[in-house]
């Protein structure tokens, strides 16, 4: 698999404190379904707000390329820690890819420096020796299925199940630390996971803005 494809843009928003204040003024909802609650976690705002389009415009400028999004995107995500997280699996991060949504992803960290913990990590699956999911119809996928005597659905199910087994199934390739007003833009086929959950309220919880898009 080829080298990681990550762009880091610091000082992303010209006035990040205004973005943070706006994000904290919005209403957050719990995950819409059990699957999202189990794997992605956190509370979301609507993507229908001014900073969604502003953020997408800044991403296009950073890439110096036009971009396309197929659905409203750019919501804020708030992730908190609670004493009620009794199950370790409920607290754990989950290694995954987002290629089914769009080819590229971006997130903006909106916590002040004094709160910044962890970041976003990228991994290689040990058994498959992949750092990203290949095209289902690629020769690479066909070779793996033949060598391991499994079908494509078996590959996808394995990746999903292994997502919580970080120490046993994955090798860490790199970590992009959280920093206030830092934007990470990356190929969403790459295996990645958030690192660090903190805070009990909106004022000190992990706050990000999330985007999925394609490049024209």
Where are these regions (language model features)?
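Fe(II)/2-oxoglutarate oxygenase catalytic core
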Residues: 1-185, 189-216
């Amino acid at each position: 698999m080829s080298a990681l494809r990550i762009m880091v843009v610091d000082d992303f928003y010209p006035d990040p404190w205004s973005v943070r204040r706006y994000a904290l003024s919005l209403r957050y909802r719990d995950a819409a379904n059990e699957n999202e609650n189990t794997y992605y976690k956190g509370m979301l705002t609507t993507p229908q707000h001014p900073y969604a389009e502003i953020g997408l415009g800044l991403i296009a400028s950073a890439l110096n390329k036009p971009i396309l999004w197929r659905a409203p995107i750019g919501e804020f995500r708030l992730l908190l820690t609670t004493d009620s997280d009794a199950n370790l699996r409920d607290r754990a991060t989950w290694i995954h890819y987002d290629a089914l949504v769009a080819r590229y992803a971006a997130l903006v960290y909106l916590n002040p420096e004094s709160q910044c913990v962890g970041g976003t990590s990228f991994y290689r699956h040990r058994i498959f020796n992949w750092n990203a999911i290949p095209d289902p119809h690629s020769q690479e996928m066909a070779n793996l299925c033949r060598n391991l005597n499994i079908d494509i659905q078996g590959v996808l199910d394995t990746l999903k199940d292994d997502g919580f087994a970080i120490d046993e199934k994955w090798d860490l390739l790199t970590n992009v630390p959280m920093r206030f007003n830092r934007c990470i833009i990356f190929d969403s086929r790459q295996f990645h996971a958030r690192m660090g959950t903190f805070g009990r309220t909106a004022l000190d919880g992990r706050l990000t803005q999330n985007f999925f898009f394609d490049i024209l």
